[in-house]
């Protein structure tokens, strides 16, 4: 019988297999940040162990980093301590670190791919659930806990139970104005936040194949929001073109050999998945969340659902609780929901294509009165590229705040937070209660919807904008 993409990569990395025990996998790339690594390094110190493979380990600062005044001391003592601890640990153990202010600093899941560290057929781990992002390259990538971080640092291996596989096939072409973020939000709403539990998801089909690498990263990034262990997309010419010439990509004959191997990383025709889901791309539309988990979403053209419409008691209760927290009413049109803040950034949508898309919509327009718009590049390198294209000027002229790289408002661990009761349209990946700050209310959206929302002041898509939203040039 043939094998799926996930099975091929898994089998290639098994160091030891024994009946009744988890497989022991070799890890090709270990990414670190300041939040989940301190106890792991402490464990190494206590046991007197070094980092096993410094050449396969890299760290960056992202979760706690400020996005303003990065040359000044960090005010919050916890954030400052975590960053200082990471710097000391990396110095003590010889781990490569890209700290705040470094040209390669940024959100770990943006930094890895842009450096060419993430490659097809590799295993990638990080103490962060959105490590699934790297599966866009045909890598087997998953988040791990702190004790597992220590295990990988010490041994470059990890014992893991083999997950099941699920194919998510997206047939046809995405309609105009529908993005990768809309697609993954629709998938999560379809299968639920627990629908992928115990599975590695493989995204397939015409719509997936036509996505750029950055769009594919958005898809795989949110696999964890469907409960999955990982998400993967088979590598192809789009993948190879993205990787070629990047700092850590193979060169010359090594490149040719790598591409030949990468081309084998496709699910065999006779392979069998444990589960399959089919999505019709033509039926999709701009999508937003209305509740407090990523599965509570609907097309922007819809209304807030009535909890009474849910047959399942637990779903009904969750919807009731979500509406109470979000301050919404059943039947309320999603487009009528006013926002206070718009956030463009994160490891989901903080790449250059995302910033270009948002900038194109706010160009020659103004952010609505009473709305605050934060634009945060996913890495310092992305920020430099955006500046070279003049995108920072576009955002600032529209009235948005242009920031330095970091996780920013994706989570309430740095100064960029919502105040209690404030509502945001956010391109990040989670909308749990308090995720963006205590009492904050989050609607997950695409960069395009975020930008249109910033201009109109309520949830909106670019199609809702008209020529009337463009200021008349002086003297005309």
Swiss-Prot record:
Residues 418-442 are annotated as: Disordered. SUPFAM superfamilies: Aconitase iron-sulfur domain. The keyword Cell wall biogenesis/degradation does not apply. Pathway: Amino-acid biosynthesis; L-leucine biosynthesis; L-leucine from 3-methyl-2-oxobutanoate: step 2/4. It catalyses: (2R,3S)-3-isopropylmalate = (2S)-2-isopropylmalate. Belongs to the aconitase/IPM isomerase family. LeuC type 1 subfamily. This is 3-isopropylmalate dehydratase large subunit. The lineage of its organism: Bacteria, Bacillati, Actinomycetota, Actinomycetes, Kitasatosporales. The gene is leuC.
